[in-house]
Structure formats: C-alpha cells, structure tokens
A protein has these predicted regions:
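Membrane-interface extramembranous regions
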Residues: 2-208
Length: 208
C-alpha cells in the first residue's frame, strides 16, 4: 500500500474499515480457538494433558482429589489408553473438572464472538478472556513442566521453555487481544451514550 494518499479522507475511511474487520476477525479467531480447545476438554487425552497445570496451581489444585506430584506416575501419552491410569484420573476428578473447564472456555469464546453485535455482552467475554489468559500464564510460575528439565544438557530451566511452556506463553497474545476488544467495546458503548445525549439536547433546543 502506498505511504502517500491523494485523498486523506478516503484513506482514513479505508483504514477504519480495515480496523473494524481486524477487530471482528479477532473475535472470530478467539471463538474458534476457545470453542475448539474447550470442546476437546471432553476427551480423555486432553483432560489428562492439563493435569500438571491444574495439580501444581495454588488457585486450581483444590478441584482435584489427589495431591501433586502423584499425577506423574499416572500420565498417559496422547493416544494411549492405560486402564489403570484412567481409573486413577477418575478418582482424581480429572475428567469432571475438564468437562467444566471446557464448558467455561466455550462460553467465553461465545461471549467474545457475540460482542460483534452486543458490546455489553462482549465486555463480559473480554474480561473473562483476560482473566482466563492471566491464569494460564501463571502456569509458567507454578508448573515445573513448562521449563526444560535438567537431564544433563546445557539448556534447562529459565528461559528455556518446554513444549508445554511454549504452548502457555502464546496466551500473552490472547490477553493482548482481550484488552484491545475490551477497549473497543467500552468505546462503542460510550459513543452510543454520547450520541444519545447529543440527540436529546438537540431535541430540547428545538422544542424551545
């Protein structure tokens, strides 16, 4: 796109259109990610995979019946079915918690998406998105598995993120998106109120 424009007003309208599209696309993207990941929480392999995060979190570990690090003896590889491990996870409330978390995640994504049409609903979703991603980022502090372990190699601990850590750190971008959406929805509501106020004042002046 050229850096100069013969019609600044036209270019400004174009930029505003691109911005609106980007904001709405951000909402759709958040919905897709949250609906997909939230839906996967209903499946055994995904429920097993989040156990290290939940078990080590001071804010979430109470949802489980077992204490960390007992889970390390009962982790299933993705795609594997080990009946003894699955039985342990049932006793731990691994699957019950995962179902509830999945429902919450899908709900947040839906609220964010509805913000396209209803900014007040969007604000609720935006705030929950920020809170959810903040909780996810806290796993970098509470979950040992987010860092490369010391197995004799030269690279371990901070700043060497493991596969789990690399997955978690991406939520910082999702959090930034939440703040952008929150600011956008607040601005929309305030603009609507100001517009209504001006219309009311105009009507009063005309009547006088």
């Amino acid at each position: 796109m050229p850096t100069t424009c013969s019609s600044p007003e036209k270019c400004l309208r174009y930029a505003e259109t691109v911005q609106r599209f980007g904001i709405n696309f951000l909402r759709v993207a958040v919905f897709i990610v949250f609906a997909w990941i939230g839906g996967l929480k209903a499946f055994q392999y995904e429920a097993d995979g989040i156990v290290p995060f939940v078990a080590n979190s001071p804010m979430m570990s109470f949802f489980y019946n077992k204490q960390a690090p007992e889970y390390k003896q009962h982790m299933n590889k993705e795609g594997a079915v080990v009946p003894a491990n699955i039985a342990w996870h049932r006793e731990n409330n691994t699957y019950g918690f995962s179902y509830g978390l999945g429902t919450l995640i899908v709900s947040i994504g839906t609220l964010v998406l509805l913000g396209i049409f209803f900014p007040k609903v969007g604000i609720i979703g935006d705030c929950l998105l920020i809170i959810m991603t903040a909780g996810t980022l806290s796993f970098l502090v509470t979950t040992p598995e987010t860092w490369v372990p010391n197995l004799g190699g030269p690279n371990h601990g901070f700043p060497y993120l493991s596969g789990a850590g690399r997955l978690v750190i991406k939520d910082i971008a999702m959090m930034a998106g939440g703040f952008i959406l929150l600011g956008t929805d607040l601005k929309r509501i305030l603009k609507a109120r100001l517009s209504s106020s001006k219309e009311g004042e105009s009507c009063c002046c005309n009547n006088n």
